[in-house]
Amino acid sequence: MIWKNYGQRTLLMPAPLLKKISMLKYISVFFLLISSQPSFADTKETYRQLSIFNEVYNRVKDQYVEEVTDKELIEKALNGMLQALDPHSSYMNEEVYKEMQIDTSGSFGGLGIEITTDKGFIKIVSPIDDTPAQKAGVQAGDYITHLDGTSVVDMTLKEAIDIMRGEVGDPITITIVRGTERPFDIEIKRDVIKVQSVKHRIINNVGVLRISTFNEQTTVGLKKSIEELEGSENPPIGYVLDLRNNPGGLLNESVTVSDVFLQKGEIVSIRGREKKDVQVFSAKKGDMINGKPLIILINEGSASASEIVAGALQDHDRAVIMGIKSFGKGSVQTIVPIDSGAVRLTIAKYYPPSGDSIQAVGIIPDVEVPRAELNVIDSYFTFRESDYRDALDNETTDGNEEEEDFNELLENDYQLSRAIDAVKTIAVLN
């Protein structure tokens, strides 16, 4: 999850002075400046460690088999330092930082997958709806072992992303390991990824809200969807909020999405290293669906912001959680701009209202429902000619075609079918 914060700037040393000292001395001063009143012993140990860094740095510069630039070495050193802390901390150079800003705005180029590092490989957290990766059959939990034949063992996320992104239309072959199956190749054509984070449908008088990611457009899109459904001639009797394969996104969006369904109470608390570093986010009065039954669908690809929403609504007994245990990412990152790049740093863990961390544990569903294929529901949430506001009617149809589509959808997506049945049951009991 990203705590969006593009405004911080840190000036470490005046520019003229930087020209007079070596890169190593700059790093040494950096470490000393960020230390809070170090003791003499701490300072001495810091200098000792930096002298080791200096020796290694000079050895690499003088003797490595290929020539490397200072910029390249320093970027790799910074990334190594941060990624050794946890998989979600990293250094972003100017190019990567710009790409990250595009990602959170909702339009970018690539394959359409959220990835992390795990066991030396690249793990797919989830494919994004209606993207080349999702259409090619990539699944949450898949491991990527090769990119165009190049092994990804111990490859950084940045290096993997650099390979996966390229010219629109150019193909890339990724080698996948899925469960106990033998590795297999999938060819995917790169495309511009335009994420419509919220889609909606009414199925059997139940509103189905699909959120694929949490970007700057998510809460606005969710509210518009609910307003449209509630304002229809036959409003839904209840809702299914589908967060399956949603890798997360912006913290503030997870808070405002949760608030759409809550009247009051804590949504999430963010706790940093110090006891005083606690921030609590609470709901404002106003449930947009007026207490109607709500089922939330999750799976192992539901992470971060998805888990905040599911956890908050579960702890307040506002929704029943169905599906499979979620991913278990309970940490918060902040983005700190430095020069033309930025540092992504884990600064806190988040806790649902219960106070129990979900880090590496995940959200446990109230009702466990086995995995279901998502290709049917994802392809169903696409626009057709009939979706246009002023589309011409076909006088020869009687509506049975749409009913058949719904039936086929529910037959192929067992989790969604169970969720819709649950909404109907709760509505009757209420």
Labelled PLM ranges:
Residues 349, 354-430:
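Conserved functional hotspot residues or short segments at active or partner-binding sites
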Residues 22-29:
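Sec-dependent signal peptide recognition
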Residues 35-36:
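N-terminal signal peptide c-region/cleavage motif recognized by signal peptidases
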Residues 64-123, 171-173, 177-187, 195-197, ...:
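Extended, small/polar residue-biased N-terminal targeting/export presequences
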Residues 41-49, 53-70, 123-127, 131-140, ...:
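Cleft-lining beta-strand/loop regions that shape enzyme active-site pockets
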Residues 303, 311, 318-321, 326-328, ...:
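Acidic, polar loop-rich interaction surfaces within structured domains
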Residues 42-55, 61-63, 69, 86-112, ...:
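Glycine-biased strand-turn-strand hairpin within the trypsin-fold
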